[in-house]
From Swiss-Prot:
Homodimer. Interacts with FtsZ. This is Cell division protein ZapA. The keyword Ribosomal protein does not apply. InterPro entries: Cell_div_ZapA-like (IPR007838), Cell_div_ZapA-like_sf (IPR036192), Cell_div_ZapA_N (IPR042233). Gene3D superfamilies: Cell division protein ZapA protomer, N-terminal domain. Pfam families: ZapA (PF05164). Keywords: Cell cycle, Cell division, Coiled coil, Cytoplasm, Septation. It comes from Actinobacillus succinogenes (strain ATCC 55618 / DSM 22257 / CCUG 43843 / 130Z). GO terms for biological process: division septum assembly; FtsZ-dependent cytokinesis; septin ring assembly. The keyword Cell division applies. One of its GO terms (cellular component) is cell septum.
Length: 107
């Protein structure tokens, strides 16, 4: 994964960084989303202080990330329980089928 330079414009600044080329579009989208959120927050807070809006947006993004991690963990636990139940059911079916004698024999 070769790193290639990318130039991003957001929050009134140009940021140059190196990232894998396949991530460039996602980084551009992230920069646009950040710009949008900060702009909306400035409007809601009725402030021109970009730094203050950035702090609130950063806190909101971290909170959203935390919620998504919790959802993922919960979903993983539910799936793990379902896998265990399915495995147990399959073991029971296999045990029953090996203990049963066939009703008839083909000769």
């Amino acid at each position: 994964m070769a790193l290639k330079p990318i130039e991003l414009n957001f929050l009134g600044q140009v940021v140059r960084l190196n990232a894998p080329e396949e991530q460039h579009n996602d980084l551009r989208d992230a920069a646009k989303e950040l710009d949008k959120r900060v702009s909306e927050m400035k409007d809601r807070m009725q402030t021109v202080q970009v730094e203050r809006a950035v702090h609130v947006v950063a806190l909101n993004l971290c909170f959203e990330l935390l919620l998504e991690k919790q959802k993922t963990k919960s979903t993983e636990q539910i799936l793990q329980n379902q896998i265990q139940q399915l495995s147990h059911s399959l073991e029971n079916i296999a045990a029953r089928s090996t203990n049963q004698q066939p009703a008839y024999e083909i000769q």
